[in-house]
Amino acid sequence: MAIDKTIIPPSEATEVAQAGHDYVNGILPLSNIFPVKSNEGSWITSWTPVIPKSKTRAMKHRALDAEIGHTKSETSTAEIHSGLIPLSGMDHISERDLTSHVNDTSYLHDKAEGKFEALGQQAGVTEEIERLQALVLGKVTVKENGADVQYSFGRPTAQQNVAPTVKWDDNKSNPVKDIEAWVKIMRKNYGRKPHAVATTGKVIDALRTNEFLRTQLSGMDLEHSKTYLSRDEVLGLLISQNGITDVLLVDEAYEDLKLDNTFNMDADVATVFPDKTFILLPSFNDSTLGATVSGPTAEAQNSEYEINKKVNDGLIGAMLTHQAPLNYDIWVNGTFVPILFEAVSTFKADVLA
């Protein structure tokens, strides 16, 4: 097996694969929460979780010429280090393709180009699925092709899979009070105040007949209140009473991409982000909350590939030839892992029965 540089050189293949990835990354909903961040060519990534600061004592006065005892100054810091793992894909141009297009390098180039772009997009899909894992579970688990790795981001137990006092598909529930209580838990654990929510259309629809919200909207008793609120009215009440400024309906965001014929992600989002999920977080545009860390590849630093990247990160692409039988492999390789830096500033509740 050898690198083919005549049909589509690795430098061009790399650009095509990266462009496919970047297109998908730019339109998928969680790319703002976990923006791609270069790991500057290193296989080891690190981040500092939020930990309580030590108490700062008051200094004491003394009389002139009087001695004073020693005090102990304390600092609180911690850094987590974790190794990255490759994210790879391979496609194929078969012997049958070659015999049907003898010496047609233009055909082979175009076919290879399409496959490099598709593999780059597939890398973006994998990253998005793992971002969903990070947000919902507070961890990312990879168990495939010899890799058996779990990245755990330390979300406090009191902020994971929490049930409201009364499930929200019960009209007697009080979502405003539940959210207020959850924010207090987050702050007690040194998390930041949330101003964004990631949930589903089913959760919002369940609240459209909620008695507390109906009376809050009307300012009157149930008898004189609307029996069925609009989604905008539900969202408006949550926004006005809980300091929420942005709500993402995750299930519908992917569905809209599909129905608008923009992009159809081949993934069961409902399995990764169940209908009952309600997540509080600081913002959808907060670069300190998380990132999709992009590490190095062996190919990018191998002179034979002639890729010549200034920084060893992102995807690479290469067309590999086999002589017996004659065919080609389309190879795309990279290193990407989403990291939730501030898990303590996120809260995940299961709000429906």
Language model feature labels by segment:
Residues 1-43, 339-353:
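N-terminal alpha-helical "arm" segments
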Residues 26-45, 117-147, 289-312:
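Contiguous N-terminal and early-domain "leader" segments and peripheral loops that mark the onset or edge
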Residues 70-73, 143, 220-225:
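Glycine-rich loops and low-complexity Gly/Arg-rich segments
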Residues 79-156, 174, 178-203, 326-333:
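Long, contiguous amphipathic alpha-helices that act as assembly "spine/axial" helices in icosahedral shell
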Residues 148-241, 246:
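Extended, solvent-exposed, turn-rich assembly/linker loops in the middle of proteins
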Residues 4, 14-21, 25, 31, ...:
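Generic detector of well-ordered alpha-helical segments enriched in charged/polar residues
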Residues 214-353:
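Sequence/fold signature of self-assembling virion shell proteins
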Residues 30-98:
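Assembly/oligomerization interface modules of large self-assembling protein complexes
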